[in-house]
């Protein structure tokens, strides 16, 4: 089991843009000295539910601040970006960091963004797949020469070529059954979302297994990752109230067709929120449901920076104990 962090960079009545960005930098430098494997940064546009619209740019900055930890995008939305530009940036970051960059990518979850970036909603899945093929060709071979319904141009060299043989490690966010099935055929590991229920994550994991088996994908090589929100406090009610305030606007935006109160309670119950027993129990169950080999933690629901660091230290101590026991 490997452990990393992810940053959502939400802003609200208690956190302004500058504070969110400064905290991300400070926590990144702090955990670089610890035993965490990686840090991934969330992409969002046009709302307060994430102030980073360019996670590759932020990744480059954070890679420059650090020495050993891997850093990358959590959900770079390839459907609304030019695939060659993504490949160029990814290869450049892979070179500059000498292999510490990770490309987590995603389909677009918001129809408004598809319209804003002038992308055809009716062909969204096809566009996503074609974008990936261009990016993958560039990362694995250094070249691409697409001829499809969306992109067609002569063979080009994508410079610089990747530092890592085969390109940087890639993950795709599990945003739908279509994406999960597509990823399983390709053998691309998933990132399970923190706001999906355990039942949904279980369903995605089982569907991935079934499709991967059909296409002879070696599941032992697949290292799915699971996002978990963390707010540990022996005053369980305080932890839950803080987390509720942190995620409320996001739930309203991203889950408009679900009962607001029920969805909030579900997320709080199925992430590591509350006292020690509640946090451990919820995290273990979530991991068991989806079979993830890596866990990505966000401590952002905790308002106090020192409290975040204290809980990070607790997790780090457990990582050290885990490695001592199993290595």
Curated annotation (Swiss-Prot):
Effect annotated for changing residue 85 to R: In strain: Hm
Keywords of this entry: Flavoprotein, FMN, Luminescence, Monooxygenase, Oxidoreductase, Photoprotein
CDD domains: Alkanal_monooxygenase
Signal listed as a keyword: no
EC number(s) given by UniProt: 1.14.14.3
UniProt xrefs under Gene3D superfamilies: Luciferase-like domain
A Gene Ontology BP annotation from the UniProt entry: bioluminescence
InterPro entries per UniProt: Alkanal_monooxygenase, Bact_Lucif_Oxidored, Bacterial_luciferase_CS, Luciferase-like_dom, Luciferase-like_sf, Luciferase_bac/NFP
Catalysed reaction equations from the record: a long-chain fatty aldehyde + FMNH2 + O2 = a long-chain fatty acid + hnu + FMN + H2O + 2 H(+)
Record GO cellular component, one term: cytosol
MF annotations from Gene Ontology: alkanal monooxygenase (FMN-linked) activity
Physiological role: Light-emitting reaction in luminous bacteria. The specific role of the beta subunit is unknown, but it is absolutely required for bioluminescence activity.
Assembly description: Heterodimer of an alpha and a beta chain.
UniProt similarity note: Belongs to the bacterial luciferase oxidoreductase family.
PANTHER family for this protein: BLR5498 PROTEIN, LUCIFERASE-LIKE MONOOXYGENASE
Protein name from the UniProt record: Alkanal monooxygenase beta chain
Species this protein is from: Photorhabdus luminescens (Xenorhabdus luminescens)
């Amino acid at each position: 089991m490997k452990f990393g962090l992810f940053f959502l960079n939400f802003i609200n009545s208690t956190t302004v843009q500058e504070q969110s960005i400064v905290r991300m930098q400070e926590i990144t430098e702090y955990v670089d000295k610890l035993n965490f494997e990686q840090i991934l940064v969330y992409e969002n546009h046009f709302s307060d539910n994430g102030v980073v619209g360019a996670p590759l740019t932020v990744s480059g900055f954070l890679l420059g601040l650090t020495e050993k930890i891997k850093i990358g995008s959590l959900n770079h939305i390839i459907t609304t970006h030019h695939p060659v530009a993504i490949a160029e940036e990814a290869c450049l970051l892979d070179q500059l960091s000498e292999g510490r960059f990770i490309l987590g990518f995603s389909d677009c979850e918001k129809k408004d963004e598809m319209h804003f970036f002038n992308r055809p909603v009716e062909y969204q899945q096809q566009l996503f797949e074609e974008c990936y093929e261009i990016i993958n060709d560039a990362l694995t071979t250094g070249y691409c020469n697409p001829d499809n319904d969306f992109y067609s141009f002569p063979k080009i060299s994508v410079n610089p070529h990747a530092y890592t043989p085969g390109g940087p490690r890639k993950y795709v966010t599990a945003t739908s059954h279509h994406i999960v099935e597509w990823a399983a055929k390709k053998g691309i590991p998933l990132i399970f979302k923190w706001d999906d229920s355990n039942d949904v994550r279980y369903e995605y994991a089982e569907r991935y297994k079934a499709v991967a088996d059909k296409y002879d994908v070696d599941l032992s090589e697949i290292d799915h990752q699971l996002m978990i929100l963390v707010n540990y406090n022996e005053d369980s009610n305080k932890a839950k109230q803080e987390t509720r305030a942190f995620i409320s606007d996001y739930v309203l935006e991203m889950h408009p067709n679900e009962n607001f109160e029920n969805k909030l309670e579900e997320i709080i119950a199925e992430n590591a929120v509350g006292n020690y027993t509640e946090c451990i129990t919820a995290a273990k169950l979530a991991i068991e449901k989806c079979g993830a080999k890596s866990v990505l933690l966000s401590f952002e629901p905790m308002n106090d920076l020192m409290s975040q660091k204290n809980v990070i230290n607790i997790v780090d101590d457990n990582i050290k104990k885990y490695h001592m026991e199993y290595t």
